[in-house]
C-alpha cells in the first residue's frame, strides 16, 4: 500500500476509476492522503442489486460531493423502482450528472410501471457522448419536442417499446452527430439492430430523410407493421435472429457500403442480392433462401464470413466464390449460433465449374473456426488451398479437447499442398 500511495494523484484517480464507487469511498480510511481523493474520481458506478434507502441516500451524497471538473462517466446498474428508489431519484441523479458535464451515461432499470420518464435536462445535455439505456417492463415516454444532443455519438437503447413511433424519431433527430445507433430488446443479447456510420456525421436533415429506416427498426424491434423499407446511405448494417424483412427501398443503389452483417435464417430473407456493393459480409443462409443466387456478383466484396450451421451452406460458398472476384479474406464459422452444430459438407457438394477468379488472384487468408476434420470438411479445405495461388495464411481453430484428434487434424492440414510456398499454417491460433 505504501508503494501505491507514492503514485501521483492522476494515476491513483485512474486506478480508482475502475472500482465501484462504494468501494472507492472505503479507501478514504487508508490514510490522510486518501481521505478526500475519492471526491475527485471522474468515473462513478453504482450497483443497485442490494439496494435500500441507505444506499439511495449514499448515491445522492457521493454524487453531490464529487469534485471532478468533468464527470467522465456515470453508471447506474440494476435499479429496481420501488418505494425507496423512485423515478424522481433517478431524475435527480441524472440532473446532477448533467450539471457536472457528464460524457458517458449508462442506466439499467427494472420498472413495474407501464411508463418511465427521463428528466428533461438529459435531452439537452451538450457534453453527453455516449448514452446506454436499458428499461424493462415499461415504455419510455415524454421525450420533449426539442431534443438537442450535439455531442452524442453512441446511443444504445434496450427498451420494450415507445409510447409513439414519433418518440423514437424525435430522440434520434436531436442527435446531430450520431455515429452509432443500437436498438435491442432488454432481455435478449442476441436480438438487435445496429446502424453505424463510421467516421462521418449524420446531420439533422438526413435523420428525417431516413424515416423509413427508423420506422423499420421500430416495427421490427417491437412487433408492429409488416411492410417496411430502408432508404439510407448506410455504411454498416447489421440484422440478426429472424427479423422479417419484406421490402428494401433503394438499398441496391448504395455504393458506399462498408460492411453488411446478415445473421438470419428463414424463408422471407431473400435480399442478399440487394447488397452486392458490400465490402464485408457475414451470412447465415442457405442458397434456397436467396432469390436468384446465380445472378449475384459482389464486385466490392473483400471479406466474407459464412456460418456453417445452415443446411446448404456449402452451395452458398460455391456461389459466393464464383461471384466475388476481389475476395481477400474467407472465413467459415459457427460461432454465432453455438447451440446448432456445424453441418458437414456432403459428398455431392458441387464445386465451382471453373476455378473462381478470387482464388486465382486475390484471396490472401482462409480461416475455419470450429474445424472438425470430417471428410466433407477436408474436401472443402483441399479445394480452396489447392487453387488459392496467392494465399498467405490458412488458419484453423478446432473446438476439440482431444489432443490426439487435434494432432491428426494438424498433420492432415499440413499435408495439403498449396501453390504458394510461403503460405503459413496456423492451427488453434488467430495470429
From Swiss-Prot:
| Stretches forming LRR repeats | 52-78, 85-109, 132-159, 160-185, 309-334
State the organism's lineage. Eukaryota, Viridiplantae, Streptophyta, Embryophyta, Tracheophyta
This chain's source organism reads Arabidopsis thaliana
Pfam families for this protein: F-box, FBD, LRR_At5g56370
Positions of the F-box domain:
1-47
**Superkingdom of this entry's organism?**
Eukaryota
Where the record annotates domain FBD, the positions are: 348-398
Q: Which UniProt keywords apply?
A: Leucine-rich repeat, Repeat
Q: What is this protein called?
A: Putative F-box/FBD/LRR-repeat protein At4g26350
Q: Which PANTHER family match?
A: EMB|CAB62440.1-RELATED, F-BOX/RNI SUPERFAMILY PROTEIN-RELATED
Q: State whether keyword RNA-binding applies.
A: no
